Amino acid sequence: MTTVAASTRPQRAEGRGHLAAKLFDGRTRIRELYQEGAAKIRLPDTFDASMEAVIINTAGGLTGGDRMDWSVDAGAGTRIDVTTQACEKIYKASAGTAEVTTSIEVGAQARVDWLPQETILFDRAALSRRLDVDLDEDSEFLAVEAVLLGRKAMGETVETGLFRDRWRIRRSGRLIHAEELRLSDGVAALAARQAVLGGQVAFATLLYAGPLSEAYLGKVRPLVEGSMGGASAWDGKLVVRLAAADGFSLRKILIPVISALRNGAPVPKVWNL
């Protein structure tokens, strides 16, 4: 008698969420909403013409082999703020790489603020992330991505792992900004280099693309002065890069910068929970 061992594939978290908005009676309204698997989208009430979307991974985190896909389509004249319910945790991967893709289209005279809370990488995590944005000629876009290499208060460190982050931002089909970040293998040793993070374990990149880039630069530079970071504006875009010793120290700089790039508006309320 021959015994055949059952082969089981570990359960993986997968999800897809899509939100499209249109302008109706001067307010941003839902045009399409689709949710599948572990991806959920919630739309809290707002008291102005904008829409706030909170995206949720009901799996509670990601590990090797998981996949999440998000897409946002902001119609002409709309205003959408997109954030996450909590920090996204990327756990140790036994096999494979977690993948997250985000696609955003911003129509004429529309604005999208992409404001997810921090991504927390644990030791031996593996994450590949991609952000693709298509802008109309006169639309605005703000993106914030913050990453923590473990939680310092919990004594966590990230010695090895994989983190790939790819951004492609286009306006009227023309590439205006690209990011290509890769941390792999000896992550701690790489982060310790002065030309990389200088030993800091919390870092963030902010990008604003729109007509106010030069005006925003004058507001942002005083906020980052004295920190490990800087801000520059050119060709209709503004880029801010920050690094700090831990997540709390990063937020103390990051939140005022985000507010400045939102004409004084605060970060979404879920950031404060």
From Swiss-Prot:
Membrane spanning residue stretches: none
Family to which this protein belongs: Belongs to the UreD family.
A single GO molecular function term of this UniProt record: nickel cation binding
Gene that encodes it: ureD
Key words of the record: Chaperone, Cytoplasm, Nickel insertion
InterPro entries: UreD
Role: Required for maturation of urease via the functional incorporation of the urease nickel metallocenter.
GO cellular component terms attached to this protein's record: cytoplasm
Coiled coil: none
Protein name, entry field: Urease accessory protein UreD
Family annotation (Pfam families): UreD (PF01774)
Record's subunit section: UreD, UreF and UreG form a complex that acts as a GTP-hydrolysis-dependent molecular chaperone, activating the urease apoprotein by helping to assemble the nickel containing metallocenter of UreC. The UreE protein probably delivers the nickel.
Localization per record: Cytoplasm
